């Protein structure tokens, strides 16, 4: 079973990668991708804080984000580079965004308020990842 602590770690990683993609976006559809990536990382960092606080209130510990990618238990490939094409960005966002959505969907054992926050995050993330990024270039 996933925990809020694990979910918050993956949300942070997604936000961090979205910020890197945002900084180095280039090429066609630059402005729309640049703005959507900013929306994505802002949503991720807002919910990272919410989920981390909820995890702590449930007796879970939250790792320092600087250590997250170094953890052996984390299944994540950080985004590296300094120039990203439209297709690369869309692929990264969809792959990693849907991974985080699936984690939230499979999170059990928390009371209704926590689940409602996870559902709200997943809905917002799904809107950005699968709808807005899915429409780029169409």
State the predicted function of each range:
Residues 14, 72-123:
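Acidic/histidine-rich alpha-helical segments that form the ligand environment
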Residues 4, 8, 15-18, 22, ...:
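A structural signal for well-ordered alpha-helices, especially hydrophobic packing surfaces
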Residues 25, 35, 62-75, 91-98, ...:
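Long, contiguous binding/interaction regions
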Residues 31-67:
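Conserved alpha-helical segments that form or flank metal/cofactor-binding pockets of metalloenzymes
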